[in-house]
Amino acid sequence: EINIGDWSSDVCSSDLQDPTAYGEDWGKPGSICELLDKLNKVPGLEWIRIMYAYPERITDDFIAAMKRNEKVVPYLDLPIQHCNDTILKNMNRRSNRAELLEVIGKLRREIPGITLRTTLIAGFPGETEEQFEDLCNFVKEVKFDRLGCFAYSAEENTVAAKMDGQIDQETKDRRAELVMQIQTGIMAQKQAEKVGQTVHVLCDGIDEESGLYLCRTTGDAPEVDGNVCVSSEEPLYPGQFYDVLVEDSDLYDLYGTVVK
């Protein structure tokens, strides 16, 4: 996501689903760091958001590039899917549990206040109750800022669809719901902690029904995360930035007024 004035665009194209792999197609892995350095110098550009980053590609150089370029917002979506080593191997993922914890810890140490989002899958073929419990404990330990969990759904002609140990739909749904219940408690606490803070937001527009302006912080990606719902007697303009005092919260959204 790139924001320049009143213009915003998702620049992560289908051939760049993992921005951290930028440059590998022409034999220059790690070129994302150089790209961020160049984008950071573009006049008028306010925010650069890296939407997806696979943990195994998050290097020290990549973290350093995020830190030194002030226009790169402290936000990453880490599509980890699971944490149990056996399940990760069966998913053909490259990271294991220890490596996931290491990269998450490093990101939080090096970039204080970074927002971390992830998506998990419950009920992958062969997932035992013990492995699912491992996933639940991982969610409790890491306390992601944003998290979605979905029941595994078999796709035709995939390796996973042909695996032994397919799990019934009721069990898959129950497991996904349990993960989201854990995350609900984490989210409620994180949201409540923001009340009383002043946050810098980008205005996306107005909700005609409520009359509230829909804005986002650096921790809110478009379409997938929540809003900062702002009441203002003066008009707010899409693409412009404002400071907002957070006065209330719910599970996904914050509510506040513009600081004058």
Protein language model features and the residues they cover:
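Terminal RNA-binding accessory module
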Residues: K162-K260
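C-terminal, non-catalytic macromolecule-binding modules
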Residues: E130, C136-D173, V179
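Short, ordered loop/turn segments at secondary-structure junctions
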Residues: Q17-P19, Y152, E233
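Conserved SAM/AdoMet-binding glycine-rich loop
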Residues: D10-E130, K140
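Single conserved hydrophobic/aromatic residue that forms the stacking wall/gate
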Residues: E1-V11
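Hydrophobic, well-ordered secondary-structure elements that form the walls
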Residues: L78, T119, V139, L147, ...
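Short acidic/polar active-site loop segments enriched in Thr and Asp
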Residues: S9-D10, E46, D145, F150, ...
